[in-house]
Amino acid sequence: SRGLGDVYKRQDMRPFRFLAFVPTIIVLVVITYLSLAKNPVHSQEFYLFEGADKLVHGCMYLGLVWIGCFDIYRVSKFTAPKLILLVCGAIVWGGLMELLQGAMSMGRSADWYDFLANSCGAILGLILGVNSVPYLFRKCKKFS
């Protein structure tokens, strides 16, 4: 049986390859909104613990890269260049978000510890994705 990856390899489907990455794109848009909007979740209304925002940053980028791993594996399996591009892209995006927060006068500020949390989350997302996504696909194949 032909998989989704085979469909996007056809010449007539090449312009639509990005559609296979819609889940990753949606997560990226949500992260961008949360990073650049002025107080998007009214964070002053609740307090968890010191550094909770760093944990949130790490989890967002972990999720972004894990979903990216899922999309890559679903379409074409893992290759080192694709995974390196994914994690480096997420890290660069995290840095860009911090720079934009510093440049925009929206009551937000650039924080290099946020960038560090974004980067750590992206790397952990890659480790988690590479080790869990193939397993999940094998498990799902058993039930189909």
Explain the meaning of each model-derived region:
Residues Y33, C69-Y73, M97, Q101, ...:
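Membrane-water interface at transmembrane helix exits
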Residues Y61-V75, C120-V133:
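Membrane-interfacial alpha-helical segments at the cytosolic side of multi-pass membrane proteins
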Residues S1-Y8:
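Short, small-residue-biased leader/transition segments that mark boundaries at the very start
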Residues D12-D71, L86:
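"…centered on the first transmembrane helix and the immediately adjacent amphipathic helix/loop
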Residues R10-N39, W112-S144:
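Terminal transmembrane helix and immediately flanking juxtamembrane interfaces
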Residues M60, L85-L96:
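Hydrophobic alpha-helical membrane segments
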Residues V75-C88, S144:
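Internal alpha-helical transmembrane segments of multi-pass membrane proteins
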Residues H42-E50, G95-I123:
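Interfacial helix-loop-helix junctions of multi-pass membrane proteins
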